[in-house]
């Protein structure tokens, strides 16, 4: 049985912080894939593992940093060396000093490597120390350190080592979904367009991302709608642009996923 120890968690407005230690036997994990509407910055303190983000696989080890964009499916696929320890920071774009900054950073590269004596390393451990305390200035302090962490990464060259891409057909499927998201209503829409069998498309998704095709498509539509709502689009205009056949079905799907209504998303 996996020995998972959550040693520290902390949440402030617009940001979450966690420090976890795992000590399982090396091998293929049973970790569930997941997706969320915010950025995630993951820093590996110890261990070696293979981590999947959409169509890419990353070999991560001590000192590596991975930046995951909102709406990207990801999970730890295989552990090569234990114990495995990592920091995770989740943050909304509007939480940091410049919401375009994280976007530009993740477009420049997803994987970075930092030295143990780097400013980034000192900052991440200062977050850990801050998470152990309760003050009336938590939000301001966390925001300041988060901004500094992103600036450190901006000044760090991306690390292209240890990155591989998935099956070429899987890449074609993801590209097709991205470009035709609003028009896809069933697996056959994808299979026919790419001259692939329905069963093969379904198999690729299960083996590569551990998720069903239409679950992936539906959640991508919801994420797109969320992004549009945050930019000021009206819920009654968003649903059709994101491929939902009617507003009630969009409302139910969105509310079930986020726990609040599309209208409430515009106000938060």
Task: Show where each model-derived region lies.
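Short acidic-glycine-tyrosine-enriched beta hairpin
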Residues: 55-70
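Short hydrophobic/aromatic patch on the recognition helix
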Residues: 63, 200-205, 249-254
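…primarily DNA-binding HTH/wHTH and HhH modules…
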Residues: 2-3, 241, 252-268
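Terminal helix-turn-helix DNA-binding modules in bacterial transcription factors
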Residues: 175, 179, 188, 207-246, ...
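Short, Lys/Arg-enriched, Trp-marked, Pro/Gly-tolerant hinge/linker segments that flank
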Residues: 106-118, 131-144, 150-197, 207-219
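A hydrophobic/aromatic-rich effector-binding and dimerization subdomain
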Residues: 1-25, 66-136, 150-157
């Amino acid at each position: 049985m996996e020995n998972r120890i959550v040693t520290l968690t902390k949440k402030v407005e617009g940001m979450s912080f966690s420090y976890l230690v795992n000590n399982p036997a090396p091998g293929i994990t049973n970790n569930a894939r997941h997706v969320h509407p915010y950025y995630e910055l993951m820093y590996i303190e110890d261990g070696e593992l293979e981590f999947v983000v959409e169509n890419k696989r990353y070999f991560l080890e001590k000192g590596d940093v991975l930046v995951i964009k909102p709406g990207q499916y990801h999970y730890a696929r295989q552990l090569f060396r234990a114990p495995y320890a990592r920091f995770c920071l989740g943050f909304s774009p509007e939480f940091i000093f410049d919401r375009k900054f994280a976007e530009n950073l993740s477009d420049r590269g997803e994987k970075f490597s930092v030295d143990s004596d780097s400013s980034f390393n000192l900052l991440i451990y200062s977050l850990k120390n801050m998470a152990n305390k309760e003050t009336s200035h938590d939000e301001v302090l966390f925001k300041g350190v988060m901004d500094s962490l992103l600036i450190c990464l901006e000044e760090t060259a991306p690390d292209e080592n240890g990155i591989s891409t998935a099956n070429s057909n899987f890449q074609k499927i993801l590209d097709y979904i991205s470009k035709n998201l609003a028009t896809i209503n069933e697996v056959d829409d994808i299979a026919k367009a790419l001259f692939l069998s329905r069963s093969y498309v379904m198999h690729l998704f299960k083996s590569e991302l551990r998720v069903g095709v239409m679950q992936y498509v539906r959640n991508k539509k919801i994420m797109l709608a969320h992004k549009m709502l945050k930019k000021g689009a009206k819920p009654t205009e968003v649903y059709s642009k994101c491929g939902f056949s009617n507003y009630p079905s969009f409302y139910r799907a969105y509310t079930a996923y986020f726990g609040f209504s599309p209208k409430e998303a515009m106000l938060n």
